[in-house]
Amino acid sequence: MHNQAPIQRRKSTRIYVGNVPIGDGAPIAVQSMTNTRTTDVEATVNQIKALERVGADIVRVSVPTMDAAEAFKLIKQQVNVPLVADIHFDYRIALKVAEYGVDCLRINPGNIGNEERIRMVVDCARDKNIPIRIGVNAGSLEKDLQEKYGEPTPQALLESAMRHVDHLDRLNFEQFKVSVKASDVFLAVESYRLLAKQIDQPLHLGITEAGGARSGAVKSAIGLGLLLSEGIGDTLRVSLAADPVEEIKVGFDILKSLRIRSRGINFIACPTCSRQEFDVIGTVNALEQRLEDIITPMDVSIIGCVVNGPGEALVSTLGVTGGNKKSGLYEDGVRKDRLDNNDMIDQLEARIRAKASQLDEARRIDVQQVEK
């Protein structure tokens, strides 16, 4: 198998968003946000359930009005994944969704109202054991910080975040996480680095407004990858102008690439050349779609010829190495069989599903033995 990442994660305190642990070594949680009208309960519930199916640990929902808060109550009753309510300006909305079982409040203490209103929200969160996310964004910095720094800078984002952190500290509230997002990769990365040195609360990572499905995924992979490789980050969202389901897929792909957290199949495939003995690209594309339901962590290498194929297969759960008319199939580094190149997709799908079932059963037995 491929080596696990030698990443030493930053030490942080732990909070819980619903039943999902955040920080203190817990698995890095992958989040997304709905883009439906929250008042359209059916559409929002359907989107949240779609996110659940692809592995979302947490889902954020914008709650801009009291009507949306009433809709949130109905939404919460119909889904299982923990929900974060995204709230700005009106403290009463925060109090209302707290009544309806929200799992986390995303607010900026600076725009939620005066000191008394902030205290009311924090006291309510404390009483109901609801964590808060302080969300600082380069696009909405306080006016005095814009004037002081002239433009968003890492120091400006840090100062904004620390204002809000200090505010919660004065109210003796410790159950919170912090984000300092920007659309510029280097601005976001340096802001998180500075913040990580200042506080020990969990950090929520993101490159905000990253872009469309392709460009946004690239920017997020670079920015989040840099931070995660340094051990910074306890939860993340990949922000894309695309179907939110894609955010979850890209988020897990980033974690899989860094060997931090695996969910489903990690496909290793060659870019192809004239040496390929079967349709590698078509095979990989078809299998990625067919096997989206597999959540068992496993490496599958699909290489079109014998130049690199055997080497990759040696360190893969399953590996295929292209050959004339038939290709070699490896399991756990050992050559087991040959597959007909003309029926590669169906054969390989069946082998992968069988291997996933075998691994799941082995893990189930291991858990039972530990429990005994």
Curated annotation (Swiss-Prot):
GO terms for molecular function: 4 iron, 4 sulfur cluster binding; 4-hydroxy-3-methylbut-2-en-1-yl diphosphate synthase activity (ferredoxin); 4-hydroxy-3-methylbut-2-enyl-diphosphate synthase activity (flavodoxin); iron ion binding. It comes from the Bacteria. GO terms for biological process: isopentenyl diphosphate biosynthetic process, methylerythritol 4-phosphate pathway; terpenoid biosynthetic process. Its EC number is 1.17.7.3. Keywords: 4Fe-4S, Iron, Iron-sulfur, Isoprene biosynthesis, Metal-binding, Oxidoreductase. Signal peptide: none annotated. Pathway: Isoprenoid biosynthesis; isopentenyl diphosphate biosynthesis via DXP pathway; isopentenyl diphosphate from 1-deoxy-D-xylulose 5-phosphate: step 5/6. [4Fe-4S] cluster binds at residues 270, 273, 305, 312. It catalyses: (2E)-4-hydroxy-3-methylbut-2-enyl diphosphate + oxidized [flavodoxin] + H2O + 2 H(+) = 2-C-methyl-D-erythritol 2,4-cyclic diphosphate + reduced [flavodoxin]. Binds 1 [4Fe-4S] cluster. Its cofactor is [4Fe-4S] cluster. Belongs to the IspG family. HAMAP family: IspG (MF_00159). Converts 2C-methyl-D-erythritol 2,4-cyclodiphosphate (ME-2,4cPP) into 1-hydroxy-2-methyl-2-(E)-butenyl 4-diphosphate. This is 4-hydroxy-3-methylbut-2-en-1-yl diphosphate synthase (flavodoxin). It comes from Escherichia coli (strain SMS-3-5 / SECEC). The lineage of its organism: Bacteria, Pseudomonadati, Pseudomonadota, Gammaproteobacteria, Enterobacterales.
